Amino acid sequence: MQQCLARRCSVAAAASVLGVSTPVGPSSSGSSVAVPFMCHHRAGLLRSTPVRLAMNLHASDLSTPDRATVNSANKKEFKTALCNELVNKITAQGYYPMSQFVKDCLTHPQYGYYAAKKNVIGSEKADFITAAEIPFFGDVLAAWVMDAWQKMGTPRVLHLVEMGPGRGTLMRTMLKQIQYSNPHLLHFLQIHLVEVGAARREEQKRALAEFQTAQGKIKWWMDLESLPFSLEPTVFIANEYFDALPVAQFRYTERGWVETCVEVDTDPGTEAHFRLVHAPSGSMSAYLIPDDIRTKGKKGDCVEVNTVGMQTMETLMKKMIDCQKAACLLIDYGKDDHMHSTLRGIRGHRFVDPLLSPGEVDLSCWVSFRQLRWALERLEVARRHLKWFPVMTQHDFLLENGIDIRLAHVIKDEETKAAMKVLQNYRRLMDKEEMGDSYKVFAFQTRNFPNVSPFFAEMPLPPLPQRDGR
């Protein structure tokens, strides 16, 4: 009964802030199957592959590329500008951590995928779409932001931070919904976009031009550490941000946990210029492997450790405590568990070998929400100032925040063809076979204001790890 009442309250709150009174992963089996249809969002892509994957990431010996036999006689692919740079760097160094390779491929200031490539999201020429491109999604997140503002006591200034804002579509949708439902809040908002890519920033500026002011209502930052404000209420949102952060991969061998690295591949019978190998020595990063995995390794075991993601969580924690009142919403595809071998390359809505064409292929991994939560649980300061909530599926989060109410009021005024498009987008967000189950939502906030809907039950804290000492 209490859960039923809680859900009714959250849906009613969502209806209120949405203004509806007026119209308005992959399987871990490691097998790959040929299929004629490809899902277009990145989690959906992991459900199917058009050809045999170039990486046998669940092999028990090495996490080394297993090249498709159809390419075995091909010459090496043409080297991209970033490929040349990486070959020189790795040749001089001998080997390169996989996490650093992924970071360079995505964020190299001149040749990185997100720094240089345009049309990577949303369009027909894009490599994938995200939920941000579907208006329903932004409307519901706007409702969540408005509820957070109300729970904080309707402060006269509210900072809204989006990490990895893509094309600016999600922020534009949220601001339009806030403008419609609560224009006073729009006046109080200060917008901050954390974006590393120069080309992407220009795209975001065009998308959000109508909301920019002479005083600079919208500002851009290279990273979270650069955000200047403190002691003012803040809401953080990250949609499909953590999946693009580099992860370290480890395999358990006779030497214990050994990091997966990249070395130059000069074999003329393989297409890529790189391959994955074991590091010749131990890694300092191995201490970041959570205890429940680190102490129970068996030969052949593989685990991904979201080292950058956990560092980002610590930065978020510090920023939120500095803001006194703050809430954060993380949405991504992943599981509330450890992830193993999930590195994937995506180009043109298809899987490709993640070691091919550096800088021209999107690289991502499924997110371990368990590790992100562990990054907070192990810190006494986080336990003292923050509270976090059980991970929800995207389906449940959107449902609890009133997406069905939104659907009913939008679709009744649409023509048949437009209504079918609306329903198609709704199903993409909600169906378990699409984004509804593979995408998860993790929320946390400071302890000094009521829980933001629909998060009612705080997650119980496990014992503080003894070895951490912090």
Give names to the regions the model predicted:
Residues 10-36:
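Low-complexity, intrinsically disordered regulatory regions enriched for serine/threonine
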Residues 286-470:
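Long, Lys/Arg- and hydrophobic-enriched amphipathic alpha-helices
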Residues 235-294, 343-348, 353:
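A mobile, often basic/glycine-rich helix-loop segment
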Residues 231-254, 303, 307, 311, ...:
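A short SAM/SAH-binding and catalytic strip from SAM-dependent methyltransferases
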Residues 2-4, 9, 17, 37-234, ...:
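Rossmann-like AdoMet
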Residues 165, 240-241, 331-334:
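Short, well-ordered beta-to-alpha junction loops that form the rim of enzyme active sites
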Residues 162, 195, 240, 259, ...:
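Acidic-residue sensor for enzyme active/binding pockets
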Residues 201, 245-246, 338:
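Conserved protein kinase catalytic core
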